[in-house]
């Protein structure tokens, strides 16, 4: 009996195993060449924009309201490839944890948690965006500060969401080029929604704009960029919507390896998060479609 109790006590708990797996996957993510390329590109953009802001005679450009595209591309879109590659190569990193009992769902959950690595980098970028506008303030605008924060905060969510989408694709597909196809689908989805900015300001055009996982809010009626404006809709609720999309991607990825009651529980979570995503999208569209001049 004593031996049995000692054996049980020596067995790692599920939480301990998940932490060990997450640390392992986070290290793999942080060392991935494409992630490092994305970080380098983001740093380069930060340097260029900071120099432009310092040289500007009339203050910071209003386009700095809508700069989330930088982490969304360098960490999010490139992160799709990272997520697919690391998910498919998980088998190679099993050796260090062979002594720890685990299952496929735990391993995928750890991979999803590792996608917070680019989110941390994007969080540093978020702080930089506010530091720049604190030193060189933006021109006065009617846009509330919460909307500005939500537009910029989307960069953090996209930096995590792209890799999560890659993890999901990596679990459910096996054909070569799946990562490239997934990135192309995301890019096309965003480009399709951008076309709605050329439409008149209505709730239908707002829906066509904000249903994408990343949207550009800043535009102008002039080809020279004069008289810029921010598109209608609610950036805050759009942020909630894309956060829910991240939850859907993570849940769908874990569903691949789940069985029995675990699978049933994940399906319930998927349905609940789907409802939250649709509700957030509806609230984003329900906001005033009028464009806010900058």
Give the ranges of each region predicted by the language model.
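Secretory targeting signals
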Residues: 46-78, 82-83, 112-180
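Cytoplasmic juxtamembrane interface segments
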Residues: 9-16, 85-98, 155, 159-189
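Transmembrane helix segments
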Residues: 177-208
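Short helix-to-coil transition segments within interhelical loops
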Residues: 97-105
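Alpha-helix N-cap/helix-start motif at helix boundaries, enriched for small hydrophobics
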Residues: 106-110
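Membrane-embedded alpha-helical segments of integral membrane proteins
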Residues: 198-257
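Hydrophobic alpha-helical transmembrane segments
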Residues: 1-89, 242-294
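Aromatic-anchored segments of alpha-helical transmembrane domains
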Residues: 42-50, 123-124, 128, 184-196, ...
